[in-house]
Amino acid sequence: GGEGRGGGSKQAALATVLYDADFPKKWFRHFFRVPGKRRNAVETRGDGYKTTHTPPENTMSHKAPKPFYPLNIAILTVSDTRTLAEDTSGQYLEDAVRAAGHNLAARTLLTDDKYHIRAQVAAWIADTNIQVVLITGGTGFYGRDNTPEAVAVLFDKTIDGFGEAFRAASIAEIGMSTLQSRALAGIANRTAVFCMPGSTGACKTAWEHVLKDQLDSRTRPCNFYPHLTRSEETS
């Protein structure tokens, strides 16, 4: 009761101030404007006439589009049971890479041998013509799943967000079974290395939800291209 009456008196006092003739009209419009709407501003001149002007558009939304720069990408499939002819996951990644406008620099298949994997990835990292390495397979918890142990020691910096983003995207498809993936990524010698599970579905999730945009130099507000080029103009 008492609070209601007091609140009503305050509202009445506020209304008196807002509707007072001497209260600047533009302040009144400020208090009651609809957020997000762009409207003409009306100002009253000293002679009593009103002038109207349109506020400028937000120039931040009109940035010039970034150019597309293709990357040289190598693909490694890790499997004890597949051959290149049966490698549907590696083939999916190759097709996706080409469709996105990038260049396939190399593609091979190795068994789950930690040292063979490490040697191949290290060679690609040392190759200044290769900017991205995509690895499919060997990221689980079985005894022969050695990809994380093979490549993590090669990283100068880890890309923690890749594994997080991949597992988050996978929840809609496989639920909490996504915890069984040790997907990881890192950068070494300006080469980005992304490790994902061996299934074709997992490769598609990683590419469509994470890699496709982050390897595209046009993606705003940021992408991996500047970290992978040795050109001073784009770094």
Segments predicted by a language model, with ranges:
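Short hydrophobic alpha-helical segments enriched in small aliphatic residues
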Residues: 20-21, 31, 41, 48, ...
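Cationic, amphipathic, low-complexity segments that mediate targeting or membrane/lipid association
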Residues: 15-29, 37
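Basic polycationic patches enriched in arginine
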Residues: 5, 29, 33, 38-39, ...
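Non-catalytic beta/alpha edge segments that cap or flank active sites
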Residues: 8, 22, 27, 52-235
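Short linear segments in intrinsically disordered or otherwise low-structure-confidence regions
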Residues: 7-11, 16, 36, 47
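Glycine-biased, low-complexity coil/linker segments
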Residues: 1-3
